[in-house]
Amino acid sequence: MSQSSVRNFCIIAHIDHGKSTLADRLIEMTGTLRHDEMCEQVMDSMELERERGITIKAKAIRLRYISKDKQEYRLNLIDTPGHVDFSYEVSRTIAACEGAILVIDATQGIQAQTLANVYLAIEYNLEIIPVINKIDLPGADIPRVMGEIKSVLGYDEDSVLQISAKLGLGVPELLEAIVNKVPAPKGNANQPLRALIFDSHYDPYKGVVAYLRVADGNINKGDDLRLMGQGTEFRVLEAGYFAPAQVAALRLDVGDVGYIATGLKSVGECRVGDTVTLQHGGAIQPLIGYHPAKAMVFAGIYPTQTDDYHELREAMEKLSLNDASLSSEPESSPLLGHGFRCGFLGLLHLDIIVERLEREFNLSLVVTSPGVSLTVTRIGGEAFTVVNPNEMPLPHEIARIEEPWVSVVIITPSKYIGTVMDLVRENYGVYKNTEYLGQLAMSELGQRVQLHYDMPLRSILTTFHDQLKSRTQGYASLDYEFIGYRDANLSKIDVLVNDVPVDAFSRIIPPDKAHEIGEALVKKLKEMIPRQLYQVTLQAAIGSKIVARADISAKRKDVIAKCYGGDITRKRKLLDKQKEGKKKMRQIGKVEVPKEAFLSVLKLQ
């Protein structure tokens, strides 16, 4: 098929705006799958994706379409995740396309992540086709959403399509818009091969299977190829496309989206975003459009049973094969044994990795409290990165601490502006500006407002999103983007059990919250640690300063139970002996902190 008849496009949307359902209708209406082969969310092949109703990994599928003027087109649809944590996957996908269908829910309007993805598409010069979905729902407010699209994105009403992906309304018109508006790929078939890898997975028989978009030249089975970034060399064992299952083909031409089986044993050798070229006579300049994923959230993952460490290690290796944005390195804790310190794109990413480890590999896990990476400079001038609270130097050794900050966009009905501003202020947010979304965008909740803030990443790590949803009755949406490191006033709080620090309970916190957090920690531990034969002292400390304390009183054995009447000195002698024994026991005794105590402390936000 000629290059002019190829169209590469993706679907971008906020989470749950009907992106995967629209992909299903496009697959069905182009006859790519028979009706009996269809299932809901064809593109979401991972069980977890269907269950949660979200797209986690980018997918690709080739569609054959005959237009109204009887011309045949090859449409390559790349499905993308919508959640903020997976914006890295979105950026890779967008770099492989010429067009994007922007899906906006008729009941919800423009959301924060919709805007983030639109700006990304504009950055890569994609042709954007705006679509209002779910027009069949009773709550659809098309004039309001149309007003938002016009004022925020600048599209007039004539260029916005109205569809119902569920019922198939307006989808034939959308297919026509794709072939008429999305430009054909620009590459040159006579130039040396250049192809962008936008995803990959590990196959036990074929090695790493790389999903790619051919920008120049072509790929044939048996070609000797090289990755320009990594320098890895391999031979193409198989080339093909997705329909949506893998279909082997003799070759992939310029503009095609497909896959190659590389035979490589680790996705680490075949990094997503790299450029593939020929080993001999290959291209000199790699393709642009790649930003490496940067882990923003760190947490420790440990097996509940220490004997399961080897199974966890194998599971982490297998997940790393398919997830380029997951980083992990071994670490050990006196309380939890051996485990891994892992880096994630965000909290949903962490949640999904843990759920996949437990579900796919049948593991029972303990996950430590998530934190961010800090840049710490010692008084001598040496700077280093801290991802684990236990790596933090003593307060008197630290010259400065820097933490990651994010630019936050919150879209909310104007009715909730006050409560949202209070929430952000409580979490150290710095106000930037306010924008109103369109003149027509009014409802009983008031006009919708876009609030811009700068915030420390640690502030939105734990319960911020849940609190935002609960304070706005679910109407607010959130998006954030990393903007750099800024000076931070932070301290490490330690928990001491009988004057012995327990590493697993250490946290990095703002000093103004020290008393509140310290009290909560020792109170929870007092409830969970069983009583001993001697008094146990629990303390929360920053450096040498104790900020909270609780005592677990000793169990008392009645040593004078056998004494009946008689001289008091006999009883006193026994009580003094008991006191001495307890004192000695306290010096040499070791308090076993149960794992349940650790888990209950983790749940404290």
Curated annotation (Swiss-Prot):
EC id: 3.6.5.n1
Membrane topology: Peripheral membrane protein
Main location: membrane
GO molecular function terms noted in the UniProt entry: GTP binding; GTPase activity; ribosome binding; translation elongation factor activity
GN (gene name): lepA
Superkingdom: Bacteria
Entry annotated with the keyword Nucleotidyltransferase: no
A GO BP annotation: positive regulation of translation
NCBIfam families assigned to the protein according to its UniProt record, in alphabetical order: lepA, small_GTP
Keyword Ribonucleoprotein attributed: no
List of residues binding GTP: D16, H17, G18, K19, S20, T21, N133, K134, I135, D136
Record's function text: Required for accurate and efficient protein synthesis under certain stress conditions. May act as a fidelity factor of the translation reaction, by catalyzing a one-codon backward translocation of tRNAs on improperly translocated ribosomes. Back-translocation proceeds from a post-translocation (POST) complex to a pre-translocation (PRE) complex, thus giving elongation factor G a second chance to translocate the tRNAs correctly. Binds to ribosomes in a GTP-dependent manner.
Name assigned to this protein: Elongation factor 4
Record's keyword terms, sorted: Cell membrane, GTP-binding, Hydrolase, Membrane, Nucleotide-binding, Protein biosynthesis
Reaction equation(s) it catalyzes: GTP + H2O = GDP + phosphate + H(+)
Pfam families linked to this entry: EFG_C (PF00679), GTP_EFTU (PF00009), LepA_C (PF06421)
Record-level GO cellular component terms: plasma membrane
tr-type G domain mapped to chain residues: 4-186
InterPro entries with a match to the protein in the record: EF-4, EFG_III/V, EFG_V-like, G_TR_CS, LepA_C_sf, LepA_CTD, LepA_IV, P-loop_NTPase
Subcellular location: Cell membrane
Stated family: Belongs to the TRAFAC class translation factor GTPase superfamily. Classic translation factor GTPase family. LepA subfamily.
